């Protein structure tokens, strides 16, 4: 402790070179770092560890639910399934138009908040998909570019 105090006083007065101390500290840090690296790459540690075999192919099954809601209360079930990353086909043809619109607005908001998508399949039939599923409609794209009857050949 007395040595530290003496060093501080000498440093304050500028009587001792700081370069020697910095070099000593750097050398100590290099030696400690080399010891840590040696411990990490010690061959006995590597041989004792067993490798893990991980299957690249995962067997996740995607579920598609087909629901025909009878009232507005079905919105909670639909949104819970969407949160569980399930694809839902919703048939709203049997609902009154005002209730169907409210239900559709609720589902669209939940889908947007979860990063999913809501697409109309047919009048009153919608597909709600989570963010990890992409829905494409190649027929719709083909019809928009070519037309229904291609008379311009």
UniProtKB/Swiss-Prot annotation:
Q: Which residues form the signal peptide?
A: none
Where it mainly occurs, coarsely classed, is: cytoplasm
* Gene Ontology cellular component annotations, sorted alphabetically: cytoplasm
What function is annotated for this protein? Answer: Cell division protein that is part of the divisome complex and is recruited early to the Z-ring. Probably stimulates Z-ring formation, perhaps through the cross-linking of FtsZ protofilaments. Its function overlaps with FtsA.
Q: What is this protein called?
A: Cell division protein SepF
UniProt lists the family membership as follows: Belongs to the SepF family.
Give GO terms for biological process.
Answer: division septum assembly; FtsZ-dependent cytokinesis
Indicate the quaternary assembly. Homodimer. Interacts with FtsZ.
Domain of life here?
Bacteria
Does this UniProt record's set of keywords contain Cell cycle? yes
Q: Name one Pfam family in it.
A: SepF
Report keywords, A-Z: Cell cycle, Cell division, Cytoplasm, Septation
SS bond partners = none
Lineage of producing organism:
Bacteria, Bacillati, Bacillota, Clostridia, Eubacteriales
Q: Which InterPro entries would you find in this protein's record?
A: Cell_div_SepF (IPR023052), Cell_div_SepF/SepF-rel (IPR007561), SepF-like_sf (IPR038594)
Where found in the cell?
A: Cytoplasm
